[in-house]
Amino acid sequence: MAFNTDPKSTNFLSPLGYRFQIKKMPTVNFFAQAVAIPSITVGEIPLPTAFSTKLQFPGDLVTFGDLVVTFRVDEDMANYLEIFNWIKSITRIDGFDAAEGQATAWGKEIDSPMGEEKVFSDATLHVLNSAMNPNKEITFTDVYPTGLTDVPFNTTLSDVDYVECTATFKFRKFDFVS
C-alpha cells in the first residue's frame, strides 16, 4: 500500500493575508500594519543521571511570547490614544492617590472587584488563504497592553513617511478556532 505524501494545499501562506481586531480598539484594528502569531515554549524538566549528560523531559508549563501589533497612527492620534488610555486606566500613572473619578480599571479600593471588562479584551487574528478568504481564526483571551513605542517626528525626511507605532500585549492563551 502506497502512502499519499501530497499536501492538501500547495499554496504558501502569504504575510499580506490577515485581518486583526481587538474589541477595545477599533481604530487600531483599521490601521494595523503588522502582527505576528506569538511564540510558544514548553518548559523542560531536567533529570540528572550518573553520566555527564542529563535527560530532558517535557514539563507542564507553557510560556507564550508577546503579541506585537504595528499600526499607522492617524492624524488625530485616536488609535494611539486608545492604547495610551487603556494603559493609563489599568495603572496608577498619576500616583497612588487617585482623585475622585480617576480610579484605575481595577477599582478605587483595594477590596473592590476587578473590572475585568475594563482591564482585558479579547482579540482575533483571521488568517486569509491565497484567495483572501478567511482560512484560520486565532483567538487571544484576556489581552492587555504592556508597552507602546514612541511617536517619532522628523523634519529632515524628504518624503512623507507616515508614523508607525508598535503596541505590545500579554494574554492568557491563544487558540486556533478554525
Language model: regions and residue ranges:
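Glycine-rich, low-complexity intrinsically disordered segments
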Residues: 1-178
